[in-house]
Amino acid sequence: MKVAVTKAKSYEKKAVGTAVDEAINLLGGWQKFIQAGDKVLIKPNMLTNVTPDKAVTTHPEVIRSVIKAVKKMGAYPAVGDSPGISNIKATAKITGILSVCEEENIPFIYFKQSKTYNYMEGRFIKQFELVDCLNDFDKIISVAKMKTHVFMGVTGAVKNLFGCIVGTEKARFHLRMQNHSDFAHVMVDLYQLIKPTLNIIDGITAMEGQGPMSGDIVNPQILIASEDGFAADLVMADKMGFNAEAMPIVSAGIGQNRIIRLADIEIVGSGKDEQFEFAKPHTYKSMQDTYIPRFILKLGQNQLTAKPVIKKSCVGCGRCSEHCPPKAITIINKHAKIDYQKCIRCYCCQELCSYQAVILQDGIILKLLKCIGIYK
């Protein structure tokens, strides 16, 4: 299995187009993936309504390059997503994705309506409620963003498909799959159901630390591409300086015998030797069960994971309350308040807060384990 890693110093159109084409050519060329007449859905990471310079969403110039390449093949591209907030059109506009679609004269599809998709091969989920238009397309291209993620360690090609679940329906999965491992297995099933033709990860700018929303911007200046999303994510996590095979989604895929190992991947391209050391999410170590004895995990899961804490800078906008899966957040006197008896540590509040007013703090047992050296 090949994964291409190419370099682009900026989001200037020519630089991005060159990097995208180099990557796809190394994988066999656009003709291997897209044929004339194909209807192609391009799925960006359009997490929330922030501008492209924040490194939260897929940059519109990467989307433009993919659109142009698909059109050049005589195919018919469209772009679509369902962000974690209700106003899809505002998000599409602010992220710059809508403008690119208008400039390139292609449709932007607002993921609003769901339908049931059966997947009997699923290990955890055999039926998904996803956006109703997926079967209208011959090919799907996932164009993700290179970021850390406080719940999943990293987010890339596979996690990007969570956006095919419409709007607040995402909360149902967080309620059903409340720990890293179970949620990761659902992502494996979701990926296998949708099975994109091609996966591209925008890492020209990226996010480290408390991603996918509140981290710090870094500049790896790379793009990653593969026909296999797990392989792309493995290489991405490794390039970020993470224990790639221990990340929940990748680990779940390995456990299901669905993916190959990092050592079996052929990495090619101008950026193949690039290596970085991203700051880890506050939750990073708690994702790796080997650090903590199993009996302790069973005794106090919430005290072993970081909890979200609302800072004084909270403006009481209500976004976290509206989208909290277990409804653990209320707004009192223009300030969010968390009921920790209900909190499931999904970190959706931290992920969606535009004011970076949600931070993560270690649980009591986690602090103790750090003090005595069991957990470093």
Residue spans of the language-model regions?
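N-terminal and secondary-structure boundary signal
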Residues: M1-V315, S321-H335, Y340, I344, ...
